[in-house]
C-alpha cells in the first residue's frame, strides 16, 4: 500500500489546513495509508498547523490589545519538549481585534505581543518563534520592546508613549538588562524595507486605516527612528524584511538580535516536514489559489521544492489553479476545486463538498495509475 503525506496550506477563508487533512484522510482511506501534516507560512493558521504536528500546550494570557484602552485574551503555543514558544503577533496586536471604524496605526501598539514574549520567557522558553503577519500596528515594535523593559524617551526625558505617533518623538533609548533571554526567530515572508516607497508605512499603513497624510507622518517617523538607532549603536535598520508588521521586523532584529526566516522554512523545520516526507511515496499539497506567487516562498512552493529535492512525486489540489503542471517538475497532476461541474460561488459556499469531490477523483487517478 502506498503511503501518502497530506501537507497542505489552509484554503484561505474556507478551510483550515487541519480540515483539509481530515477530509483527505476520510476520502483516501482505507485504500491508501495517509499521514496528515498541515502547514502554514507564518500567517493565518500557524499555531494550529504546529499544534497538529507537535505535542503542544495552549497558553492563554490577558494582555494589552492593539488599542490603548483594550485588553484581549491571547493564546500562544508552548512546546515543552522543544522548550519553544510559538507566538502569533495577530493574537495580541492584530488588525481583526480592532473594531470597525477604529483602525489607526498612529495609536495601535504591539505592547501585548511583548507581554506574550515575557510570559513565555518566564515559563522557561529557550526559543521563541514569532509570526508577525496580520498586525494592526506601525510602531516598529516599540510597544513590544517597552513590554520587555526598553525605554524610549523624548527630548524632555518623558516616555514617547504608544503607537506609530511615538516614532518621531524618540530622542533617547535606554535598553534593559536582559539576562539569558530566549533566542527569538521572526517568521516573515514579505521583503519590504523599513521606510520609503516600498516600506512599512507606504505599503501597509493604508490597509490599517491610515489616510495619505498619516502615511507620510508614519514614514517620517520610521525615518527618524532609523536615524536615532543609527546614532545609538550604528545599526542600519532599513534592510529587506525590516518593514514587516509596521516595522516590527526591523525593530526586533535590531533590539533582540533576532533571526528573520521564511515562515514556511521555520515551520517545516520545526515540524520535521522533510523527515515525514522521506517516509512516504507521494505528497499531496494544496491551497486556496495556486498561482505564479505560489512557488515563491509560499507553502505549496516550499513543499514542491522539498519533494523535488528528495525525489518524491506530488499532486496539487487547489481551490483554483492558474499554473500549468508542465512548468512544475515532479508534479503528477493538478486538481482544481473550481471547474465546469463546480462553479466558484458553489465551491466557496460548500468547500467541504467541493474538496471531497476532487479528492474522490484523486483517489480514482491513483488507483488507475497503480494498475
From Swiss-Prot:
Pfam families: Gly_kinase (PF02595). Gene3D superfamilies: Glycerate kinase, domain 1, Glycerate kinase, domain 2. It comes from the Bacteria. GO terms for molecular function: glycerate 2-kinase activity; glycerate kinase activity. Keywords: Kinase, Transferase. Signal peptide: none annotated. One of its GO terms (biological process) is organic acid phosphorylation. The keyword Transferase applies. Belongs to the glycerate kinase type-1 family. This is Uncharacterized protein slr1840. It comes from Synechocystis sp. (strain ATCC 27184 / PCC 6803 / Kazusa).
Amino acid at each position: 500500500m502506498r503511503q501518502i503525506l497530506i501537507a497542505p496550506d489552509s484554503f484561505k477563508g474556507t478551510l483550515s489546513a487541519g480540515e483539509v487533512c481530515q477530509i483527505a484522510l476520510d476520502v483516501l482511506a482505507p485504500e491508501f495509508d495517509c499521514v496528515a501534516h498541515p502547514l502554514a507560512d507564518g500567517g493565518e493558521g500557524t499555531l494550529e498547523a504546529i499544534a497538529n504536528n507537535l505535542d503542544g500546550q495552549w497558553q492563554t494570557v490577558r494582555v494589552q490589545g492593539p488599542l490603548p484602552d483594550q485588553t484581549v485574551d491571547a493564546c500562544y503555543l508552548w512546546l515543552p519538549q522543544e522548550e519553544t514558544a510559538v507566538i502569533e503577533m495577530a493574537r495580541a496586536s492584530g488588525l481583526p481585534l480592532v473594531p470597525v471604524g477604529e483602525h489607526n496605526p498612529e495609536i495601535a501598539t504591539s505592547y501585548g505581543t511583548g507581554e506574550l514574549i515575557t510570559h513565555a520567557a518566564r515559563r522557561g522558553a529557550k526559543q521563541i518563534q514569532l509570526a508577525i503577519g496580520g498586525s494592526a500596528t506601525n510602531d516598529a515594535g516599540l510597544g513590544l520592546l517597552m513590554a520587555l523593559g526598553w525605554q524610549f524617551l523624548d527630548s524632555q526625558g518623558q516616555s514617547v508613549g504608544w503607537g506609530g505617533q511615538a516614532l518621531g518623538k524618540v530622542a533617547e533609548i535606554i535598553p534593559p538588562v536582559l539576562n539569558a533571554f530566549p533566542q527569538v526567530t521572526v517568521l516573515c515572508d514579505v521583503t519590504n524595507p523599513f521606510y520609503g516607497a516600498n516600506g512599512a508605512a507606504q505599503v501597509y499603513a493604508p490597509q490599517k486605516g491610515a489616510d495619505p497624510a498619516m502615511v507620510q507622518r508614519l514614514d517620517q517617523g520610521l525615518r527618524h527612528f532609523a536615524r536615532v538607532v543609527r546614532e545609538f549603536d550604528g545599526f542600519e535598520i532599513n534592510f529587506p524584511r525590516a518593514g514587516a508588521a509596521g516595522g516590527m521586523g526591523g525593530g526586533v532584529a535590531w533590539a533582540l538580535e533576532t533571526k528573520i526566516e521564511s515562515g514556511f522554512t521555520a515551520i517545516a523545520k520545526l515540524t520535521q516536514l522533510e523527515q515525514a516526507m522521506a517516509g512516504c511515496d507521494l505528497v499531496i499539497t494544496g491551497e486556496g489559489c495556486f498561482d505564479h506567487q505560489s512557488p515563491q516562498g509560499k507553502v505549496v512552493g516550499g513543499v514542491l521544492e522539498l519533494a523535488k529535492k528528495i525525489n518524491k512525486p506530488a499532486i496539487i489540489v487547489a481551490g483554483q489553479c492558474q499554473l500549468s503542471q508542465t512548468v512544475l517538475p515532479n508534479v503528477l497532476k493538478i486538481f482544481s476545486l473550481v471547474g465546469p461541474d463546480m462553479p466558484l460561488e458553489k465551491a466557496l459556499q460548500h468547500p467541504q463538498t467541493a474538496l471531497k469531490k476532487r479528492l474522490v477523483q484523486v483517489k480514482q487517478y491513483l488507483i488507475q495509475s497503480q494498475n
